[in-house]
């Protein structure tokens, strides 16, 4: 399996394509709150993915150097989700809460789909 450092550019581009679609949906449909929520959640999801890749790199580097590895950033991912919820609750007419949560889960779904597609290509 490829490491996250090599897969990250591909995953980032998929998420940026999704963000572009969400921006088009926000601009051309009447579902502004839903697409704004997807944009907020997916943008924070992209940050979480970048942070996860960075933490895994630091984790592996610490193991290689024989040091005690630090956490892989779970608290930061929870804090990002909490930030998204606080923003959504503060502006309920602007952001749809369920679409924010779906957006936050985007990078998990993109990773799974990418893994399945890459495994099918190798066969």
From Swiss-Prot:
Which InterPro entries does the annotation name?
ATP_synth_I, ATP_synth_I_Bacilli
Keywords linked to the UniProt accession: Cell membrane, CF(0), Hydrogen ion transport, Ion transport, Membrane, Transmembrane, Transmembrane helix, Transport
Q: Name one GO cellular component term.
A: plasma membrane
Q: Which PANTHER family match?
A: ATP SYNTHASE PROTEIN I (PTHR40035:SF1)
Q: Which GO terms describe its biological process?
A: proton transmembrane transport
Organism the protein comes from = Priestia megaterium (strain ATCC 12872 / QMB1551)
Regarding the membrane, this protein is recorded as: Multi-pass membrane protein
What the record says about family reads: Belongs to the bacterial AtpI family.
Spans through the membrane = 15-35, 36-53, 72-92, 97-117
**Protein role:** A possible function for this protein is to guide the assembly of the membrane sector of the ATPase enzyme complex.
Subcellular location per UniProt equals:
Cell membrane
Q: Any idea what this protein is called?
A: ATP synthase protein I
């Amino acid at each position: 399996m490829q490491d996250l450092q090599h897969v990250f550019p591909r995953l980032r581009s998929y998420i940026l394509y999704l963000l572009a679609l969400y921006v088009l949906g926000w601009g051309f449909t009447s579902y502004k709150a839903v697409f704004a929520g997807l944009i907020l959640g997916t943008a924070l999801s992209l940050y979480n993915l970048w942070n996860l890749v960075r933490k895994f790199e630091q984790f592996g580097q610490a193991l290689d150097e024989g040091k005690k590895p630090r956490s892989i950033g779970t608290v930061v991912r929870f804090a990002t989700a909490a930030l998204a919820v606080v923003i959504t609750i503060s502006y309920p007419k602007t952001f749809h809460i369920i679409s924010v949560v779906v957006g936050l889960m985007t990078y998990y779904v993109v990773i799974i789909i990418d893994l399945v597609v890459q495994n099918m290509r190798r066969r």
